[in-house]
């Protein structure tokens, strides 16, 4: 008997196991860890999971949902094979583990949605975290649309923890039909502000999280315009089930204690157009977090960046680009687009709007003593959602901080 289970996995008998699990036993979900495939067999992830998906589909079981567990974001290919994928090492019932997993998922919102999710691992509610840490754990899993699997003994769970797990407003947030993952719109000091649409895309209702992962009190000053909310704004605390006073003056001010979160449902009189699009919101088709390839495209910290992050190692080939898929304009028209980038010699940048002719930017700053430089170009946006792509098909592109949009007066 092999205590490590070597030889007992799917490898080599996919059809046999799939027949048993899905045809005979009738299961419709399977979580597939990569145990042994990388360490002992040195298999390639995309190829291996594709073989398993094909074996299941060949049985007429295309309805079966797969969860890929490679303990890191595996790559954009996962979306074609699975409904969800793990993005981190296994969770532990410790604050450091919860914080680490949230950190891993802060900039992966572009890969969630339309029935596909970044899996932050099972819930450790009721296993020793402090009450405010449990609120962070459950609240952030909900607003980031992670699958929710209870990981504690329900016969011994504390009453306060059980009450949190049964919070209908947080569960509704997680199960919102749009299925979107909240993204970071502000990172100042140690605090993060995340937001996402709920109920209706481009509607007046949004979910917002003020998240303090630090060990000290954190002050938040959140302008409503960065949340794209205009006019009078109502807010409801989804953890405490309390309506808050109407937000006046266009700014939400709060202080949060260490290891805490405020999860809000916010409703405004009108929805505003975004004027800033961060690089860390972009979809990167060549991105993965496996760490196998040096100089591969990545979201990277940069203190001087508007949101504290940049995208590095763009370009070098046509398919290695950054893409913002929902750049919204109410009426369409002419805009000035200002791109903030990190100067570097011998770099170019191609910009493409709605798959039309590329704009080649080669008159760019190479002064590496500048932390951030910018260039402004005219662009035409159609009414509704627009797709903006940046990269370079023939050389490395510049690292991107963000771009801003300003409508040209007619």
Please report, for each region that a protein language model flagged, where it lies by residue.
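Active-site-adjacent "subsite" loops/lids of carbohydrate-active enzymes
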Residues: 1-38
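Stable alpha-helical elements in mature extracytoplasmic
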Residues: 14-18, 48, 52, 136-139
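Loop/turn elements at helix/coil->beta-strand transitions in domains of secreted/extracellular proteins
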Residues: 25-30, 60-65, 204
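Active-site-adjacent beta->alpha loops and helix N-cap segments on the catalytic face
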Residues: 38-52
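Glycan-recognition surfaces
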Residues: 47, 57-153
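Aromatic- and carboxylate-lined catalytic core of secreted/periplasmic carbohydrate-active enzymes
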Residues: 114, 118-189, 269-273
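Carbohydrate-binding surface patches
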Residues: 141-144, 149-151, 187-229, 259, ...
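Extracytoplasmic
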Residues: 229-235, 246, 250-410
